[in-house]
């Protein structure tokens, strides 16, 4: 009888000792779920990775969200303030010396080499399309670097970044700073390395970027609102197929083999590390880096992570 009583008391003490730990786990899970729900109510497409130690929220960001796109940044801000850490993109690190290099070597980045002209590199059809845009906008792109021409078409002629609202990165960064939440970033690229990469690139390597930029500009400004609308309704494949998103993804640095691979490796590694951390991580990642074929989501899935959210391909 005494042994039965002692065994019963021992079992009860174990159960009582486990109760606080179980309560803590339950409270933590409820808190993480609340953060996820609040973040999802912002309207931005996102994915979650649940692990034994916490949750990672991956917010798929597009740059230059049109003001006509009905999303709610304040809800993402609210969720961020309750997170344990955030991961956001890092700006390149330019030194004063890099600025001087750009000034003295500017022509190497803005002009075709050896006094070359566009027809030296483009097919007759490509050159004819460029000529039509030159006539429409009263511009001379004949000597210009294809990358600079593409940027001019997208930013000034298509004017894709006019009348925009806050990017998700800006929202999360400001919220994290106000709430004193840890901010993690991928390693910053040095300005010197970026300038060297651009200077050494074959002009022909930027032709796909130019072609995509011409296609987006020819399609007209309706694609800007269409891209934002697809993003808001979580139609990720449609966003990725939008001519503007295609153009942005075809241009430097994303399309550069060396830089593009490093960018994707950095994001994949940081998110995998976050999945092994305790608590909730909010990561704002460029949508194209997440959702492209063999992108971050594909890589994480291949590593065995269970990913919940909208279809990305």
Question: What annotation goes with each model-predicted range?
Answer:
Residues 9, 68, 293:
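Active-site-proximal flexible loops/turns
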Residues 28-39, 43-255, 259:
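Structured, acidic catalytic/metal-binding patches in enzyme active sites
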Residues 1-9:
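Bacterial N-terminal signal peptides that target proteins for export
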Residues 253-313:
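A cross-kingdom marker for long, charged
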Residues 18-19:
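N-terminal signal peptide c-region/cleavage motif recognized by signal peptidases
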Residues 9-15:
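Hydrophobic helical h-region of N-terminal Sec-dependent signal peptides
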